[in-house]
């Protein structure tokens, strides 16, 4: 009986030990993720001339639209990206057209 329990435990270790782990990470320094109907991070600071990549990691469609009208991604489907280069110093506020009532779907890029 003991050998059956040992064998069963070994099998469980092998099966679960070989399962792929999904890592939950964070965006890179010039990256904003659209996930869980929110921007992550909601605020980012970059140098003038920096390009920011917005990546939709959510199942829902999103957009990245500047309050000033400077940029508008249009619809960003799941898994797609939008990039924009910020050449002028200032603070640029943006939101998602699809979820603009959600305060988590608003953000700011601070260009130094």
Model-predicted segments: where are they?
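Bacterial Sec-dependent N-terminal signal peptides
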Residues: 2, 6, 13-36
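N-terminal, post-signal-peptide metal-ligating segments of extracellular/periplasmic oxidoreductases
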Residues: 24-53, 111
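Extracytoplasmic/periplasmic beta-strand context in beta-sandwich domains
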Residues: 30, 62-63, 107-108
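Non-cytosolic beta-sheet module surface loops
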Residues: 36, 55-58, 98-100
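Beta-strand cores of secreted/periplasmic/IMS beta-sandwich domains, seen most often
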Residues: 42-58, 81-88
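Short, Lys/Arg- and Gly-enriched loop/turn segments at beta-strand edges
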Residues: 60-69
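Extracellular/periplasmic metallocenter environments
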Residues: 77-112
């Amino acid at each position: 009986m003991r050998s059956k329990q040992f064998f069963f435990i070994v099998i469980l270790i092998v099966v679960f030990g070989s399962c792929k782990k999904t890592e939950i990470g964070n965006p890179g320094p010039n990256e904003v993720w659209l996930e869980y109907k929110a921007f992550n991070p909601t605020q980012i600071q970059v140098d003038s001339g920096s390009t920011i990549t917005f990546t939709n990691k959510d199942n829902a469609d999103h957009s990245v639209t500047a309050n000033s009208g400077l940029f508008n991604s249009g619809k960003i489907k799941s898994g797609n990206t939008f990039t924009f280069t910020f050449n002028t110093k200032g603070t640029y506020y943006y939101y998602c057209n699809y979820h603009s009532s959600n305060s988590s779907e608003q953000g700011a890029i601070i260009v130094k």
